[in-house]
């Protein structure tokens, strides 16, 4: 008699995905982030569901309902801060996951990579709409500024913005639809994650060497299930430390002031995980140009498989490319810092310089360095 785990139509899928899955024997902790993102998504859906039970999507009561959750609901403060800081953890892991993909050349799995970029866009949209829901000052003005960017689209722009707003400004209709979208998107993301995994399991995982590992595979369970559980443990320690000791560390104090359309905050800025893109947006003094730069700063990820010019897949044995990779990371950190600074000298110049370096490194420096490394192989 065959084992139920291997014969049952439903359990069989789980078995082939998480138990009897052949995995490379040498994948490092950088491969932990996929499972951590899965845990994050589950955590966000769970905490979000409980928050939605007490939240009201109405301009007059939204802010009060969040206050009510924190003050009157049993462990409401815990659920709220786990949800808010869980989003931060989600983005940290996302950026690590993408960075790992770039460093080890995982983007050569085109299907997996492209659905991953669509996932990134979906998560960014969800996070943006979630930030609007507490209806604080930064929620309101963030929504106003970011949705207003769409008015830069030629011909249909202004009409499109009013259509998204559901009126002539960010108001009750906007908040209601943002709540609806914020609720539904995580489930769409879950479906996309399944497609992401489906494509990944077609090819099997990449590994640090970037070489074919078919000759040396080990079962996913128990080796990587244990490794993933350890990763989850570290994640929960970090998340709960944030939630319990400094829950507002990554938030904006302005969001503790109820939304007021008549009073603009001195510095409008998004959550920390969008600051790098916000800095790129602000570094171009033209509205449409800025919007295009903003979109392309993420879309540029789709070019990585095309721009790959090295004979080796991974950067493990390419010191020059490694230098550029870490330069890119440092540059993104500089952009993140600039995005949170006021628009004045010297921050404007630093932001413009960092934006140029960002695109220049990815589009020109990295491919040309890879070609040079190919030449060096012949020495």
Swiss-Prot record:
<dbReference type="InterPro" id="IPR016174">
    <property type="entry name" value="Di-haem_cyt_TM"/>
</dbReference>
<feature type="transmembrane region" description="Helical">
    <location>
        <begin position="320"/>
        <end position="340"/>
    </location>
</feature>
<feature type="binding site">
    <location>
        <position position="201"/>
    </location>
    <ligand>
        <name>a ubiquinone</name>
    </ligand>
</feature>
<feature type="binding site" description="axial binding residue">
    <location>
        <position position="83"/>
    </location>
    <ligand>
        <name>heme b b562</name>
    </ligand>
</feature>
<feature type="transmembrane region" description="Helical">
    <location>
        <begin position="33"/>
        <end position="53"/>
    </location>
</feature>
<keyword id="KW-0813">Transport</keyword>
<protein>
    <recommendedName>
        <fullName>Cytochrome b</fullName>
    </recommendedName>
</protein>
<keyword id="KW-0496">Mitochondrion</keyword>
<comment type="function">
    <text>Component of the ubiquinol-cytochrome c reductase complex (complex III or cytochrome b-c1 complex) that is part of the mitochondrial respiratory chain. The b-c1 complex mediates electron transfer from ubiquinol to cytochrome c. Contributes to the generation of a proton gradient across the mitochondrial membrane that is then used for ATP synthesis.</text>
</comment>
<comment type="subunit">
    <text>The cytochrome bc1 complex contains 11 subunits: 3 respiratory subunits (MT-CYB, CYC1 and UQCRFS1), 2 core proteins (UQCRC1 and UQCRC2) and 6 low-molecular weight proteins (UQCRH/QCR6, UQCRB/QCR7, UQCRQ/QCR8, UQCR10/QCR9, UQCR11/QCR10 and a cleavage product of UQCRFS1). This cytochrome bc1 complex then forms a dimer.</text>
</comment>
<dbReference type="InterPro" id="IPR036150">
    <property type="entry name" value="Cyt_b/b6_C_sf"/>
</dbReference>
<dbReference type="GO" id="GO:0045275">
    <property type="term" value="C:respiratory chain complex III"/>
</dbReference>
<dbReference type="GO" id="GO:0006122">
    <property type="term" value="P:mitochondrial electron transport, ubiquinol to cytochrome c"/>
</dbReference>
<dbReference type="InterPro" id="IPR048260">
    <property type="entry name" value="Cytochrome_b_C_euk/bac"/>
</dbReference>
<feature type="binding site" description="axial binding residue">
    <location>
        <position position="196"/>
    </location>
    <ligand>
        <name>heme b b566</name>
    </ligand>
</feature>
<keyword id="KW-0830">Ubiquinone</keyword>
<keyword id="KW-0249">Electron transport</keyword>
<dbReference type="GO" id="GO:0008121">
    <property type="term" value="F:ubiquinol-cytochrome-c reductase activity"/>
</dbReference>
<feature type="transmembrane region" description="Helical">
    <location>
        <begin position="77"/>
        <end position="98"/>
    </location>
</feature>
<feature type="transmembrane region" description="Helical">
    <location>
        <begin position="226"/>
        <end position="246"/>
    </location>
</feature>
<dbReference type="GO" id="GO:0046872">
    <property type="term" value="F:metal ion binding"/>
</dbReference>
<dbReference type="InterPro" id="IPR005797">
    <property type="entry name" value="Cyt_b/b6_N"/>
</dbReference>
<comment type="similarity">
    <text>Belongs to the cytochrome b family.</text>
</comment>
<keyword id="KW-0999">Mitochondrion inner membrane</keyword>
<dbReference type="Pfam" id="PF00032">
    <property type="entry name" value="Cytochrom_B_C"/>
</dbReference>
<keyword id="KW-0408">Iron</keyword>
<keyword id="KW-0349">Heme</keyword>
<dbReference type="GO" id="GO:0005743">
    <property type="term" value="C:mitochondrial inner membrane"/>
</dbReference>
<feature type="transmembrane region" description="Helical">
    <location>
        <begin position="178"/>
        <end position="198"/>
    </location>
</feature>
<keyword id="KW-0679">Respiratory chain</keyword>
<feature type="transmembrane region" description="Helical">
    <location>
        <begin position="288"/>
        <end position="308"/>
    </location>
</feature>
<keyword id="KW-0812">Transmembrane</keyword>
<feature type="transmembrane region" description="Helical">
    <location>
        <begin position="347"/>
        <end position="367"/>
    </location>
</feature>
<dbReference type="InterPro" id="IPR027387">
    <property type="entry name" value="Cytb/b6-like_sf"/>
</dbReference>
<dbReference type="Pfam" id="PF00033">
    <property type="entry name" value="Cytochrome_B"/>
</dbReference>
<feature type="binding site" description="axial binding residue">
    <location>
        <position position="182"/>
    </location>
    <ligand>
        <name>heme b b562</name>
    </ligand>
</feature>
<dbReference type="InterPro" id="IPR005798">
    <property type="entry name" value="Cyt_b/b6_C"/>
</dbReference>
<feature type="binding site" description="axial binding residue">
    <location>
        <position position="97"/>
    </location>
    <ligand>
        <name>heme b b566</name>
    </ligand>
</feature>
<feature type="transmembrane region" description="Helical">
    <location>
        <begin position="113"/>
        <end position="133"/>
    </location>
</feature>
<keyword id="KW-0479">Metal-binding</keyword>
<dbReference type="InterPro" id="IPR030689">
    <property type="entry name" value="Cytochrome_b"/>
</dbReference>
<keyword id="KW-0472">Membrane</keyword>
């Amino acid at each position: 008699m065959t084992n139920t785990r291997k014969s049952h139509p439903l359990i069989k899928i789980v078995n082939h995905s998480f138990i009897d899955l052949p995995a490379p024997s040498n994948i490092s902790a950088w491969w932990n982030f996929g499972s951590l993102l899965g845990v994050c998504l589950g955590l966000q859906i769970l905490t979000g569901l409980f928050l939605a039970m007490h939240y009201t999507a109405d301009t007059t009561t939204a802010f009060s309902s969040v206050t009510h959750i924190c003050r009157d609901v049993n462990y409401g403060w815990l659920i709220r801060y786990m949800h808010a800081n869980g989003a931060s953890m989600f983005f940290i892991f996302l950026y690590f996951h993408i960075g790992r993909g770039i460093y080890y050349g995982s983007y050569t799995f085109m299907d997996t990579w492209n659905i991953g970029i669509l996932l990134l866009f979906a998560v960014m949209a969800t996070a943006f709409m979630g930030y609007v829901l507490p209806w604080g000052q930064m929620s309101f003005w963030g929504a106003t500024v970011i949705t207003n960017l769409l008015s830069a689209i030629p011909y249909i722009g202004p009409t499109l913005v009013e259509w998204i707003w559901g009126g002539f400004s960010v108001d009750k209709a906007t908040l209601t639809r943002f709540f609806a979208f914020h609720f539904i998107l995580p489930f769409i993301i879950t479906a996309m994650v399944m497609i992401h995994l489906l494509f990944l399991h077609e090819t099997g995982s990449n590994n640090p060497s970037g070489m074919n590992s078919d000759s040396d595979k080990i079962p996913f369970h128990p080796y990587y299930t244990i490794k993933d559980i350890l990763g989850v443990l570290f994640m929960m320690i970090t998340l709960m430390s944030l939630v319990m000791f400094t829950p507002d560390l990554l938030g904006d104090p302005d969001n503790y002031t109820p939304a007021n359309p008549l009073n603009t905050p001195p510095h409008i800025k998004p959550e920390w995980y969008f600051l790098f893109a916000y800095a790129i947006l602000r570094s171009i003094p033209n509205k449409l140009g800025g919007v295009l730069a903003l979109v392309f700063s993420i879309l540029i990820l789709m070019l990585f498989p095309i721009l790959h010019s090295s004979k080796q897949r991974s950067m493990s044995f390419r010191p020059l490319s490694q230098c550029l990779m870490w330069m890119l990371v440092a540059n993104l950190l500089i952009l993140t810092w600039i995005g949170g600074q006021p628009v004045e000298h010297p921050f404007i110049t630093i932001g413009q310089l960092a934006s140029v370096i960002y695109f220049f490194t990815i589009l020109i420096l990295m491919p040309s360095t890879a070609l040079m490394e190919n030449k060096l192989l012949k020495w």
